[in-house]
């Protein structure tokens, strides 16, 4: 997949940033429950007056940033974060940890359901999809239950 990056845009890393209503709860969820590596955190004592955390997903070339923000909407069903896990066993381990912590599952698109994924809500109500394959590395699983 690395050789697919366009030479006309030679970016060295990508960061996705999202607002969160409760930075500490978000930090506990992504860092504690999902165990994403916390790369950096900053408090509101900066030029922008914004506090936040940055997680590596799965390394420093792709990062996920959350900042404390006034959320003006509850998002929509297309606002998803998908974590591609190496296999069904890894998915079960992470899903069990989320369920035991009281994280609720949510209705997911048929695409994910038919391919063995599980969908949860993050602290801000956004969809977190756990998929049991690595996109771009593994073949996408054949849909199950479609037309059975």
Where do the PLM segments sit?
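Short beta-strand/turn micro-motifs at beta-sheet edges
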Residues: 2-5, 67-71
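Conserved beta-strand in the GNAT
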Residues: 64-67, 129-131
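Flexible, active-site-proximal loop/turn residues at the rims of small-molecule/cofactor binding pockets
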Residues: 45, 87, 134
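Vicinal oxygen chelate
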Residues: 1-9, 12-22, 53-58, 72-148, ...
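A short beta-turn/loop motif at secondary-structure boundaries
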Residues: 44-47, 72-73, 110-113
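A short, sequence-level motif marking secondary-structure junctions
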Residues: 68-73, 134-136
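Core segments of cupin and vicinal oxygen chelate
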Residues: 8, 17-61
């Amino acid at each position: 997949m690395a050789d697919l990056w366009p030479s006309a845009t030679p970016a060295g890393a990508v960061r996705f940033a999202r607002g969160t209503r409760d930075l500490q709860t978000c930090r506990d969820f992504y860092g504690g429950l999902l165990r994403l590596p916390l790369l950096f955190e900053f408090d509101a004592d900066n030029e922008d007056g914004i506090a936040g955390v940055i997680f590596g997903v799965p390394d420093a070339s792709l990062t996920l940033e959350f900042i404390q923000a006034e959320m003006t909407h509850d998002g929509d069903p297309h606002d998803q974060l998908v974590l591609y896990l190496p296999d069904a066993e890894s998915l079960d381990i992470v899903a069990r940890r989320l369920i035991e912590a009281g994280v609720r599952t949510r209705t997911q698109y048929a695409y994910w359901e038919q391919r063995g994924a599980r969908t949860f809500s993050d602290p801000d109500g956004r969809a977190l999809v756990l998929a049991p394959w690595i996109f771009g590395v593994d073949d996408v699983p054949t849909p199950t239950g479609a037309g059975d």
